[in-house]
């Protein structure tokens, strides 16, 4: 059960609608590196678009404004028209976070979001997650192997070893 919904009973359209409420952040960023930051963020809208708009990359003014606002929320609005492969790892992770924010999720699931980042950048990304949780009231669930970061940032920590809860 997630937020009062028994996810095991969902199928088809109701399952897709439920999944749209959950944003995903991946360790490897999952960006299209040969295109601009703004185009990467705009991909958040593709699942809700008619096939012909998705095929030809036609986005509405409102979608573009939401994408720019999401970039602003993570502090990289100035990188909107830069190719994703020209960014640092921390900036790429912020693009992934902006893409997730653009879909207006209620929950963000982050899989090792700081694993490939240096300690200073990892702290900045974790600060972003904390601010988003606090200011936007979005639940953030992070899978992380850095115990010290988990203890520093999380309001609740669950330790798992070999499939068993140990903490």
Predicted features, each with a name:
Residues 5-6, 49-78:
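Conserved ABC ATPase "signature" region
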Residues 83-87, 91:
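Conserved ABC ATPase signature
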Residues 104:
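Conserved catalytic motifs of ABC-family nucleotide-binding domains
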Residues 108-111:
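Catalytic Walker B motif of ABC-type/P-loop ATPase nucleotide-binding domains
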Residues 119-121:
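Helix N-cap at the start of a conserved alpha-helix in ABC-type nucleotide-binding domains
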Residues 123-135:
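Helical segment within the ABC ATPase nucleotide-binding domain
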Residues 144-145:
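H-loop/switch region of ABC-family ATPase nucleotide-binding domains
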